[in-house]
Amino acid sequence: MAAASSSDSDSGRAESNEANSKWLDAHYDPMANIHTFSSCLSLADLHGDGEYKLVVGDLGPGGQQPRLKVLKGPTVLTESPLPALPASAATFLMDQHEPRTPALALASGPCVYVYKNLRPYFKFSLPQLPPNPLEQDVWNQAKEDQIDPLTLKEMLEDIREKADVPLSVQSLRFLQLELSEMEAFVNQHKSKVIKRQTVITTMTTLKKNLADEDAASCLVLGTESKELLVLDPEAFTILAKMSLPSVPVFLEVSGQFDVEFRLTAACRNGSIYILRRDSKHPKYCIELSAQPVGLVRVHKVLVVGSTQESLHGFTHKGKKLWTVQMPAAILTMNLLEQRSRGLQAVMAALANGEVRIYRDKALLNVIHAPDAVTSLCFGRYGREDNTLIMTTRGGGLIIKILKRTAVFVEGTGEVGPPLAQTTKLSVPRKTRLYVDQTLREREAGTAMHRTFQTDLYLLRLRAARAYVQALESSLSPMSTTAREPLKLHAVVQGLGPTFKLTLHLQNTSTARPVLGLHVCFLYNKALYALPQAFFKVPLLVPGLSYPLETFVESLSSKGISDMIKVLVLREGQSAPLLSAHINMPVSEGLAAA
């Protein structure tokens, strides 16, 4: 009876959670064998029949060949092998002709494979890069039998370590061979031309000339050679090429190519670069404190996930808006757009199995998955508008549908004021002294204000007089003269009785060196001893800080200290250019003795 009641309570709790959830569980297959990333998922009406299908670039784990899969509902409609691992998948309209059937672009290796009606349509290959001239020369020597394979390997390894241009695939394969296989490889490939090919790291789409949903779009490619390429949607020619300081891994775009657009690229060096139309190099740069793991544009805010388990919000000019800490590491991110309610939010899948949905830094919803989610996609699937598709680390497929009555509310989901507004503040009671002071301020407010203003003016006058006196007597550590613009500061090191005194003297002019200066120390000879109280300063080059070191010996055993004055003098002048007063510390060695 107890077991039966426990089972009934668990089932009742599950039904209650499902009733309170904003999502309907449409499908869950833990053995779907789909291993992919968010960039390799795309939803599109591939046949123009109103039935949206899911395009998956499957990585093919466990030695399996990568494959392109198209799913209709929970079942796989078609499969086709890929020559290399997929980097990204996107659907776009190539032209304005009827019927308006979108094309499918899949980036894999150095190529973009374009499909129409799920049939191969076009293959775009990245242009080849010029090879390393040193590498070309080494292979020419091997072609003429001037060097043996072992020498060839040593020279290629030396080039790989020192050269900025990476080696070709042919040379990299040769360096991986055993000694017995090298000679046959050299004889087979020494007559071939050295080719250096880059690969695609990320891809997205950019509207060509209209912002409409059914307008033609260009493909934007990020490559391993630190470049961004914009392709024409019909001829597949390169319309624009932009350079980046590092390899792009995530891309976000806005605008139209023929009007005005903005490209945002998150790169491997931990920075985010923002480019505008007609700019060959980045206009803005956002430096992150950790590597980015995702980039999503929500309205005009760039949301970045980092390896420090946090989400950051930035403007398009790089200004940081907010930061939200996550309870676990972020695995992947994507955009949630509910067009019927005008909602845009960011989805972040965490390593603890949670999928968190944020609007700015406000938490809207949390989904608990049975396994860590590695890819996310939200949009129209089949004939349902708001469908969430997730794949898990173990290869599972999860499909959820957002309820039509679901409304996302910030925080815990409860409508009303936050709990902090209902908490009473512990305001202290008014004391007799507080009441008397309030009455006094009301009665004598004008006189109190006049007294305050008089004291303030006197303080400003005394400060101005002291400043003028310091300038006239060169008591300041900075020189205000145009001929000798100098800056001085001192550092005392040690516990005593011997201290190390370091003077940092800097010529702050832009192009004029300073010569003929001397340094003089004024001190109490009964308390301190210096090896040299007057010495000449070398030539001061503009912009450099010169450390001038000396040692100070404390002679007093009574635990007292005094001030040492440092004067910077010009030869032939009695007034010092600079001066500094150094308060010496108490000698701990003599005090302890």
Curated annotation (Swiss-Prot):
GO terms for molecular function: patched binding; phosphoprotein binding; RNA polymerase II-specific DNA-binding transcription factor binding; signaling receptor binding; smoothened binding. The keyword ATP-binding does not apply. SUPFAM superfamilies: Quinoprotein alcohol dehydrogenase-like. InterPro entries: BBS1, BBS1_N, GAE_BBS1, Quinoprotein_ADH-like_sf. Pfam families: BBS1 (PF14779), GAE_BBS1 (PF23304). Disruption phenotype: Mice are anosmic (inability to perceive odors) and have defective olfactory cilia. Significant reduction in olfactory sensory neurons ciliation in the olfactory epithelium with decreased cilium length and number. Impaired cilium localization of the BBSome complex. It comes from the Eukaryota. It is found in: Cell projection, Cilium membrane; Cytoplasm; Cytoplasm, Cytoskeleton, Microtubule organizing center, Centrosome, Centriolar satellite. One of its GO terms (biological process) is adult behavior. The modification N-acetylalanine is found at residue 2. Keywords: Acetylation, Cell membrane, Cell projection, Cilium, Cilium biogenesis/degradation, Cytoplasm, Cytoskeleton, Membrane, Olfaction, Protein transport, Sensory transduction, Transport, Vision. The keyword Cell membrane applies. GO terms for cellular component: BBSome; centriolar satellite; centrosome; ciliary basal body; ciliary membrane; cilium; cytoplasm; motile cilium. PANTHER family: BARDET-BIEDL SYNDROME 1 PROTEIN. Part of BBSome complex, that contains BBS1, BBS2, BBS4, BBS5, BBS7, BBS8/TTC8, BBS9 and BBIP10. Interacts with the C-terminus of RAB3IP. Interacts with CCDC28B and ALDOB. Interacts with PKD1. The BBSome complex is thought to function as a coat complex required for sorting of specific membrane proteins to the primary cilia. The BBSome complex is required for ciliogenesis but is dispensable for centriolar satellite function. This ciliogenic function is mediated in part by the Rab8 GDP/GTP exchange factor, which localizes to the basal body and contacts the BBSome. Rab8(GTP) enters the primary cilium and promotes extension of the ciliary membrane. This is BBSome complex member BBS1.
